[in-house]
Amino acid sequence: MKKKALILFIMASAALIIYPNYVKSQTVEPIIIGAPIPRASTYGQNGERSMILAMEEINAAGGIRVGTVKRPIKLEIVDTRDEEPGVPTSEVLLAIEKLILDKKVKILAGGPCMSECCLAALDLYPKYKVISIVNIGCWTPGWHAKTGKDIATYKYSFRLSGNVAYWIPNIVTLLNNIKEKYGFNKMYITVAEAAHCKAAAAAVEKGSVAGGWTIVGKEVHPLATTDFSMMLRDVRKSGAQVLFIWDHTPEALAMVNQWQDMKIPAPAIGFVGPTEDPVMWKQTGGKVAYLVEFAGEGGTLPGQEITSLTKPFFNAFKKRWGDEPRGTGNVPSYTVLYLLKDAIERTGSLDVDTLVTAIEQTDMISAGGRLRFDKTNHQAIYGTDPKETLMPQLLQWQDGKRVCIWPSKIASGEYKLPPWVKSPK
């Protein structure tokens, strides 16, 4: 019996000598990451799933090395509800503030997602000296306009998700490509009553008119609108040859169904929130056919190879959750924890100011392209070359599949005109 106890003692001692960091990682406190997320919304669910996947991968590999010790990540998720109709900004801010104070977090990653809430939240982070990395939504150009005017005050804030200032030039380029190919030049614009939607409308109008388009109609509809038949009749009457849409709400799916049922002779192109979901073909009975959807940050569509990390992310997500990733928010949310891991391990520190400097200096390959930040406003840089920037993506529903058609460097197929639409050429 004594001999057996001695052998066990020797084995345990050997484990301490050979695997000291492994043993330490089992006993140290986790690194707490506060995650403000609108959990009822599609985008919030995208972000939450991808953050959980990254956390599980990092923890399975031993955690994050802080000096000589590896520590696991723990996500403290709070439901901000900012994508739900009627939830005031004050309640969203209160949820974030409560997370900071109750859980003593020094790093936040996630949302808010709604642009108005995201802008208001910027003033919380310098107050409490906590890092915030927005990786779900908040597509308003107002965010980087505000941080860029006073980066010394807003130094704790970073945005890993993209914004319409990046998205729209890509979309306008696609629109002009379609214009030249098919001879179209008349456009109708419809958007939801939200800051980033109206900013998208203004930017598309400006870019398209410069490219030779004529805007034959414009409409802004309230959030949660479900009947678009009157607007679509106006589209038909206007002679529009393209219908540009920007509406992030789940209710916007009704517009696509009605567009298809009414066979509106104008291809639908833009951002219709739920239609990036891989279940949409089945759910709508194929009524999303030929819709061109801006699908957020690149890296979530079948067959993409933006970088060597794109397919591993896609496959890991599908294995973990049983579905292909949707679009908006997924890749930034997966990337954000690897970004933090990189910054913490480079500095060996969890000091907030030290990490701010490290995040500013980030230059890493992600599932969505090359990740770097603009040091003047802390916005992650997006473009059209994955060797230099993060990537956007546009898909078209073709024969039940989500096909990436733009930007050209990551496209897996070409745009197809709906069969009921006639080209002047």
Mark where each language-model region is.
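Short, low-complexity disordered leader/linker segments with a strong preference
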Residues: M1-I32, I100-D102, V421-K425
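Immediate post-signal peptide segment of exported/extracytoplasmic ligand-binding proteins
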Residues: Y22-G34, R65-K74, N176-K186
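Beta-alpha junction/loop-to-helix N-cap segments that form part of ligand/metal-binding clefts
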Residues: V28, Y43-R49, I64-G148, L160, ...
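Extracytoplasmic "Venus flytrap"
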Residues: G34-I52, V78-P85, P112, T190-A199, ...
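Short, polar/charged alpha-helical segment
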Residues: G44-V66, A202-A210
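Extracytoplasmic ligand/sensor domains, especially the bilobed periplasmic-binding protein
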Residues: V105-K218, P267-E293
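Extracellular/periplasmic periplasmic-binding protein-like sensory domains
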Residues: W259-Y334, E345-R346, C404-G413, P418-P424
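Segments of small-molecule ligand-sensing domains
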Residues: A316-N330, K341-C404
